[in-house]
């Protein structure tokens, strides 16, 4: 009983947590397998940001309980945000789950599985479900292990645990990596359950993060994405500003100085974290990719106040304009919630106008979801579902049109692309531009991990297609 499959729901933070758990388990002698049908232990790392995410995981767990009836030694565990949010109450719906572990206890999973395995091997009944959702000081420092494919068996899952190359003799090398720098959130947005599921804001020591990035570079990683619930708040309680430079920008500077790291990204920030020092960093740190995920949530000042979001539409637009002044080809993505309680047609129109003006390349548009225990859930002015759906579809159509137009502008330009590995078909290769655009192209395995010049020959709404340039960069980008 040592084959483990981890299925991850939700954000990049969850992906990184799953990778760390997988690496810890592998170090204890467990095998991480890509196919859930081949496992003895299945762990669901869950999301709670919307009710639909929880229901999806509950549905999957309910289905897996049937497997336990046929396979008594099969172990089912629920990890992460839903485990933290619901705790032992999950057993009302899922009585056969063996393990429920919250967001500050991921590092305890190997020990709990060791105990379960020892009991099974000894023929001892398991007894009560293990439930551990307590807070633990220093837990932010435990998400540091990486499951690099070159260190794993050919049937193991790579770092994202969702992108296994089917049919390969061995997994491709890992070129990109997530690095957790901060956990928790103190923002208390009226719609959000994250402070409950992730706890208070906690940052890792800067030296530890830099050392982790240095080790990744030595193992072939060329791009790192720094992760945190509010990543721009990194270190504000632990470090001081130096010459007007925030701790987060100081961290960017140190990672930027590392040999081998060619690109730096980060997510998810908060608009209030974009002070002059961070904006200026885009002009003086060339490894910092010209792509910003900048959550908007609403373009109405009235709704922003109701959401407890401490900025205005005017300030948000100032940030976008300031970043584009530093880099004219800056790419933007965002988060928007439609149908927040009390949102009127006028409020939504203000959101639509700002959404259009900011010229986003990508957006995650969500219908407001009631989350029990949040201030917004108690409001009596909930927006009807059909109105939410109408507003949602309108913004998605605007996004589709804008993405199609902006991608079309890239036709016959030459983009710098980091070759990440074979695409899903295994017939071609994939990589991303500095602006986070996915590209598909023909290449050779020796180019994996290298920055190449790609002439864009075809564009869809979400993907670029191109051909390698043997020399030169071609004409300048023409972005509008």
From Swiss-Prot:
Domain MTTase N-terminal, residue spans: 2-118
Entry note: cofactor: Binds 2 [4Fe-4S] clusters. One cluster is coordinated with 3 cysteines and an exchangeable S-adenosyl-L-methionine.
- Where does the record say this protein resides? Cytoplasm
The residues covered by the TRAM domain are 408-470
The UniProt record gives the binding positions of [4Fe-4S] cluster 1 as 11, 47, 81
Q: Where is the composition biased (Low complexity)?
A: 149-159
Q: Does the keyword DNA repair apply?
A: no
Q: State a single Gene Ontology molecular function.
A: N6-isopentenyladenosine methylthiotransferase activity
The UniProt entry lists the main location of this chain as cytoplasm
Q: Which PROSITE patterns match?
A: MTTASE_N, MTTASE_RADICAL, RADICAL_SAM, TRAM
The positions annotated for binding [4Fe-4S] cluster 2 are 185, 189, 192
Per its UniProt record, what InterPro entries does this chain match?
Elp3/MiaA/NifB-like_rSAM, Methylthiotransferase, Methylthiotransferase_CS, Methylthiotransferase_N, Methylthiotransferase_N_sf, MiaB_methiolase, rSAM, rSAM_horseshoe
What is the enzyme's main class? transferase
> Which keywords accompany this UniProt record?
4Fe-4S, Cytoplasm, Iron, Iron-sulfur, Metal-binding, S-adenosyl-L-methionine, Transferase, tRNA processing
Q: Name one GO cellular component term.
A: cytosol
Q: Which cofactor does it need?
A: [4Fe-4S] cluster
Task of the protein: Catalyzes the methylthiolation of N6-(dimethylallyl)adenosine (i(6)A), leading to the formation of 2-methylthio-N6-(dimethylallyl)adenosine (ms(2)i(6)A) at position 37 in tRNAs that read codons beginning with uridine.
| Family the entry assigns | Belongs to the methylthiotransferase family. MiaB subfamily.
Query: What does the subunit comment say?
Result: Monomer.
Q: What is this protein called?
A: tRNA-2-methylthio-N(6)-dimethylallyladenosine synthase
